[in-house]
Regions:
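Structural preference for solvent-exposed beta-strand-turn elements
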Residues: 1-161
Length: 161
């Protein structure tokens, strides 16, 4: 799989396939970093069923974005570069931990994510982000510390599974 973000030219995620999965919520951090705003449609379900996205939205706010929830979806906006923060998640959600990692790696300053998910896919994501230039430390007790960097580079990675 080749992922090329240089072809992205808008802060808006369109609806056609996005209501069938939960992926659009994970695009908010990237679009905030690139455009200073992100608009994503309301999430659809997945094999697990309908799940809330409030941890993702709260995380974006903790990093300095403002988030509006509308019937059609979510709009997040930042005034300049996102700022590192300390965020204790109410539950160790895999998706919300991914959002926090994506928000933090390009934010200014240090971020600490507490009560983070530690599933294998999170460890693989951290490995990938480190190979792209991210500075990430793991502490016991579900704590991840991230030093924000100015930019990330491309990478090659083999995915588990």
């Amino acid at each position: 799989m080749n992922i090329d973000p240089t072809t992205v030219n808008t802060h808006k995620v369109t609806t056609p396939d996005s209501r069938n999965n939960r992926l659009p919520i994970l695009l908010i951090p990237f679009l905030l970093h690139k455009y200073g705003q992100a608009t994503v449609p309301t999430m659809g379900g997945c094999n697990i069923g309908k799940r809330k996205v409030d941890f993702h939205l709260t995380a974006a706010e903790m990093f300095g974005a403002t988030v509006e929830t509308k019937e059609s979806g979510y709009h997040a906006k930042s005034n300049g570069r996102l700022q590192g923060t300390h965020y204790t998640m109410p539950y160790p959600s895999v998706g919300a931990t991914e959002s926090c990692l994506f928000l933090s790696v390009l934010s200014e300053g240090t971020s600490v994510i507490r009560n983070a998910a530690i599933e294998p896919e999170i460890m693989e994501l951290i490995t990938m982000l480190r190979s792209m230039g991210a500075i990430i430390f793991l502490n016991p007790n579900r704590e991840i510390i991230i030093e924000g960097v100015e930019k990330l580079t491309g990478t090659n990675m083999y995915v588990l599974g």
